[in-house]
Amino acid sequence: MTTRKYFGTDGIRGRVGQFPITPEFMLKLGWAAGMAFRKMGACRILVGKDTRISGYMFESALEAGLSAAGADVLLLGPMPTPAIAYLTRTFHAEAGIVISASHNPHYDNGIKFFSGQGTKLPDEIEMMIEELLDAPMTVAESENLGKVSRINDAAGRYIEFCKSSVPTSTDFAGLKVVIDCAHGATYKVAPNVFRELGAQVVVLSAQPDGLNINKDCGSTHMEALQAAVVAEHADMGIGFDGDGDRVLMVDHTGTIVDGDELLYIIARDLHERGRLQGGVVGTLMSNLGLELALAEQNIPFVRANVGDRYVIAELLERNWQIGGENSGHIVCFQHATTGDAIIASLQVILALRRSGISLAEARLKLRKCPQILINVRFEGSSVDPVTHPSVQEACARVTEQMAGRGRVLLRKSGTEPLVRVMVEGEDEAQVRAYAEELAKLVAEVCA
């Protein structure tokens, strides 16, 4: 496959003001995308964003580029990433564009695309956009310029879609839930979904100012949510990330329930009701305990590369319906075409209500193995620390010493200049020692 110049594992992402996250590039990207989709005929493109301040700047630039290429533009404003995937389908648009850097701080931003089916763009379309980015920009004749309009009922449409993922008889009366919206794209829609289903809702971090997205809140900083659940005597807490495609939860004791545990709760419920199609897709980072617990239920399990696009690709290839990551990306194909945090959390609550147990009790049904993850920064290094002979040798030695009762995984982040060192096994002290040893070696190789 041709090497991509601009697109990473999940679109294009980086620091605002540094290439390619600049207004000039976004103008050209809008034009290139518009030209690529125009090759299929007249086209409409949806554009949505999260709440970071730079989103307004990039929205305007993309809008101008798309219009210059002759593509019509529908602006959604701040909306969760999965909402943009859904609305792209329902508006029969040729594509959807999301302006977001997901769980990253406000000073980062990025772009990702959805196809007209609400799925990741095919590789050939990405490559066509890449080629056009390096071509001279042209402008359509005046009468052929794209028209731009704003969709004012997008939030209401998506709220109804989320509610449609649960039976019409669903009533969350008696359920008290704390929701942390990360000052992000779910801040309007998520509280309304749960309120309209009858839950008592306490809302945290739903006052976006353009700079506070993901700051000490949401699924990457769960401390405030944990404290609020205990203080409010709530049944559970739900923590979303800035663009609403990942979710972690908190049980009534204030304990975090991660993506592996949430995935297991949903999968087990589907399996017990005879509704599980095939098996479950995890990733290389999924806890060994998840694999073992699913095996006890005779549920097939496979690991994809890290990243929701790889989970989705594996699900499509196997014609399975459910998969996810321990970070909280959970894909329920029976309801949505991509990871959807609100829909995933609704499926967890439904599973708990069917089984009659609390989130705390459900969490304990999955016995996780100790897993230590250490991030090592490597900026400007010409050496690939993952494939370096001394690092490979050390990984092989540690794997041999764990004698089949653990795993070692080294991988480079697709979005940040990090090497992730993960060691997993039965003895936490031993696992930590191995992880620290390998991380130290990786840092030395990078230096």
Swiss-Prot record:
One of its GO terms (molecular function) is phosphomannomutase activity. The modification Phosphoserine is found at S102. It comes from the Bacteria. The active site is at S102. It is an enzyme of class 5 (isomerase). Keywords: Isomerase, Magnesium, Metal-binding, Phosphoprotein. The keyword Membrane does not apply. Activated by phosphorylation. InterPro entries: A-D-PHexomutase_a/b/a-I (IPR005844), A-D-PHexomutase_a/b/a-I/II/III (IPR016055), A-D-PHexomutase_a/b/a-II (IPR005845), A-D-PHexomutase_a/b/a-III (IPR005846), A-D-PHexomutase_C (IPR005843), A-D-PHexomutase_C_sf (IPR036900), A-D-PHexomutase_CS (IPR016066), Alpha-D-phosphohexomutase_SF (IPR005841). GO terms for cellular component: cytosol. Its EC number is 5.4.2.10. Gene3D superfamilies: Alpha-D-Glucose-1,6-Bisphosphate, subunit A, domain 3, Alpha-D-phosphohexomutase, C-terminal domain. Binds 1 Mg(2+) ion per subunit. It catalyses: alpha-D-glucosamine 1-phosphate = D-glucosamine 6-phosphate. Disulfide bonds: none annotated. One of its GO terms (biological process) is carbohydrate metabolic process. Mg(2+) binds at S102, D241, D243, D245. Belongs to the phosphohexose mutase family. Catalyzes the conversion of glucosamine-6-phosphate to glucosamine-1-phosphate. This is Phosphoglucosamine mutase.
